[in-house]
């Protein structure tokens, strides 16, 4: 395993531990039921039946290998641009330490557009799946 991946997984284990101390799986699931899901699978199926390329556009501020991509980073503006230019879905990086993402970025994107929103993070525990559900993710990338 690469050194950076080991660091990321170690950090995720700490985050999961903190998440479990402050939340229960059942409470996060209950919160998640308050969101109307936007049909990630249905959107992709519709693009396919129309013989159109379905683009999942990514909101990503930084990466461990490239650093920060952009200093003026407006999640709402990016989301609107992706939707108006025909994206099928929006993927939002939520890893804070290594990709400068956040759960708040996912919420901002979700509140600004009607597209399904995917949470992209290093998901290593079922409580993170429940957390994703609780913040309004329509799907996750494992």
What are these regions, as identified by a protein language model?
Residues 2-70:
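An N-cap/entry alpha-helix motif that binds or orients negatively charged groups
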Residues 34, 69-73, 100, 123:
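Conserved phosphate-coordination/catalytic loops
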Residues 45-49, 83, 106-111, 133:
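Surface-exposed amphipathic alpha-helices with a cationic face
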Residues 55-59, 90-92, 117-120, 140-142:
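Hydrophobic faces of well-ordered beta-strands that scaffold small-molecule active sites
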Residues 56-64, 73, 91-94, 103:
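Arg/Lys-rich RNA-binding interfaces used to dock onto structured RNA substrates
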Residues 67-93, 112, 126-139:
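Alpha/beta enzyme core
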Residues 94-113, 122-130:
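Active-site-adjacent beta->alpha loops and helix N-cap segments on the catalytic face
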């Amino acid at each position: 395993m690469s050194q950076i991946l080991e660091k990321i997984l170690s950090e995720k284990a700490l985050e999961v531990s903190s998440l479990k101390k402050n939340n229960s799986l059942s409470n996060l699931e209950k919160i998640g039921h308050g969101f109307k899901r936007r049909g990630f699978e249905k959107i992709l199926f519709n693009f396919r039946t129309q013989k159109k390329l379905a683009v999942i556009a990514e909101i990503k501020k930084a990466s461990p290998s490239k650093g920060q991509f952009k200093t003026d980073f407006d999640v709402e503006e990016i989301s609107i641009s992706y939707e108006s230019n025909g994206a099928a879905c929006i993927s939002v990086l939520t890893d804070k330490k290594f990709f400068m993402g956040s759960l708040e970025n996912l919420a901002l994107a979700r509140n600004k557009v009607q597209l399904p929103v995917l949470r992209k993070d290093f998901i290593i525990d079922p409580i993170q799946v429940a957390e994703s559900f609780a913040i309004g993710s329509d799907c996750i990338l494992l």
